[in-house]
Structures are given as structure tokens and as C-alpha cells.
Amino acid sequence: MIDLRSDTVTRPSRAMLEAMMAAPVGDDVYGDDPTVNALQDYAAELSGKEAAIFLPTGTQANLVALLSHCERGEEYIVGQAAHNYLFEAGGAAVLGSIQPQPIDAAADGTLPLDKVAMKIKPDDIHFARTKLLSLENTHNGKVLPREYLKDAWEFTRERNLALHVDGARIFNAVVAYGSELKELTQYCDSFTICLSKGLGTPVGSLLVGNRDYIKRAIRWRKMTGGGMRQSGILAAAGMYALKNNVARLQEDHDNAAWMAEQLREAGADVMRQDTNMLFVRVGEENAAALGEYMKARNVLINASPIVRLVTHLDVSREQLAEVAAHWRAFLAR
């Protein structure tokens, strides 16, 4: 089965599984798991931050990030289509009494700082206190411009706001920039990394920031049910991924660009391609039929009027050629 629904469908390689089986473990709630500690230290080192915390999921990592920045009755400014606003079940509001203030992102995925400024609340008892600006990099595959990251950082310093980056796919941005992680993360107070998307682990995310912030995050992780015991088995997969699966993300980007060109040549309406994602307009009338057609040929896609295809380490160029051939045949019916 060729699965292009998301890079979350990746499976651990044999080498990763061997690293997991060989991992020394301890009780991480006590802080005694050496593999978890090594992963957290390595993430902090890569990013130039002081500390990191390993969590089961990206949704929990984002929730803990917001809870550790904001008190009840405070708010964060966020994009309308941001994952930690739209796709995480309203956790910040429901569990943290943190008010989201969404704004529309620009075409390049940035939140225009003039619009952000207009949403910062005055010091008035009628309003929630604005505490945090939350960005996403990459955002729907788009890499935020480097200069914007610097501008957003300086903007938040001037306005006494914290800056968090949902970096679920931040290493896709790192590869696209051709930079080191710390070149991006110097411009934020905290950020997350999802290890189970393009990096290929079965589970796990990291939240990274300064020591005091991560100390608060450890308490919130425990409160929200994320304290794990011998989790070094999972952390070993994360360590393997960070040391072996980052540079290869360029292959996913190249495959996505190649696939976009193949589909264009086949007559498909390819809207855009960024990093490891491409978006193809198929229309309401063709969405279900295309999904069924592809599934019958052992290809899984999200059947919707605009299809998002995501390349990853478990999909080869040869398999993408098969998908392109099926797409061409579907259009020629």
C-alpha cells in the first residue's frame, strides 16, 4: 500500500527498532531514564536552548507549551489554520482557560505583525491579557522566511510577549533553509519537535526552552497524563531519528517536487508544492471517486476537493511514478 495521506504514517526502520531494543531505561518520572535524558539533552544542544522535555504526542506538547506560558484568563495570538488552534480539540481553552485570538495568515504562512499588533489587548479589565504569539514552521508545508522569524522575535521583545513555535516539522524547515536548527530557534522562547512525522519514529515529541520554562512544563506534563516510566524505549527512536533521519528529508522534498511536475504533465491542477507537501485541486465532484479509484489500486489519499499529498521515508520515487500513472489514467477516463 502506498500511503500519501500524511508523514505520520511512517514506520520505524529495522535499525531504529534495534536501537529501541538496546536502549537502557529507568523511571522517567523520577528523571532516571538515561535514554530520555540523553535525548532531551541532545535536543537542547542542537537548538541552543537550555532544556527539553519528552512527551508522548505533539498535541500534548503544544498543550503543555501553552499551559507553561499562559495563566488562566490570558490569551495567545495564533493563525486561523494553526494546528494548536484548529486541530487540537480546543485543549488550551478547555483545559487551560487560555483564550485563543486567531488571525488570518499571509500566503507565505506568516502572521502579519501589523495584524498581530492590532490584536494585542490593552491593559483593561474587560480583556484577556495577551501573553503569547504562536507561530508554526513549517505551516502547511510552507517554510517561514528567515527574516520574518527575526522580525517576529524583535516584535515580541518590544511588546513583552513570549514567542512559541509549533515546530512539528521544523526539521523540514531546517533542511529547506540549509541551516542548523539553532539558526531558527534562536528566535523563539520555546518550540516543539514532532518525532513521529517525517523523522519516522513510532511516537513522541519534544518541547524545548529555558530551564525554568521546562521545569513548569514537567509539572504540566504530569498533570495532563504524560509522565511515563521506562520511556527510553521510545526516546531511543527519537535519538536515532535526530542523528540519522534529518538530512534525508531533502529526499522527501525532492520527491514532492518531482511528483508535482508529473501530475502537472498528466493534466492535474497542482496548486502548489512546498517541502514534502503538494496540494492538488480535484473538485467536489471528483473527490470521492478519485479516493476510491486510488484505494482500489493500493494508494491511500485523503479524498477531498483539494487533495494534500505528503511524501515521506516510506514512499519511493518508483512508487510515486505508479501514483502519477494512476492519476493520469483517472483523468483520462
Curated annotation (Swiss-Prot):
Biological process according to GO: glycine biosynthetic process; threonine catabolic process
GO cellular component labels: cytosol
Enzyme class: lyase
Signal peptide location: none
InterPro entries attached to this UniProt entry: ArAA_b-elim_lyase/Thr_aldolase (IPR001597), Low_specificity_L-TA-like (IPR023603), PyrdxlP-dep_Trfase (IPR015424), PyrdxlP-dep_Trfase_major (IPR015421), PyrdxlP-dep_Trfase_small (IPR015422)
EC number: 4.1.2.48
Catalysed conversion reaction: L-threonine = acetaldehyde + glycine; L-allo-threonine = acetaldehyde + glycine
Keyword list, A-Z: Lyase, Pyridoxal phosphate
Cofactor(s) for this UniProt protein: pyridoxal 5'-phosphate
Residue(s) carrying N6-(pyridoxal phosphate)lysine: 197
Entry-linked PANTHER family: L-THREONINE ALDOLASE, L-THREONINE ALDOLASE-RELATED
Assembly and binders: Homotetramer.
Protein's name in the database: Low specificity L-threonine aldolase
Organism: Escherichia coli O157:H7
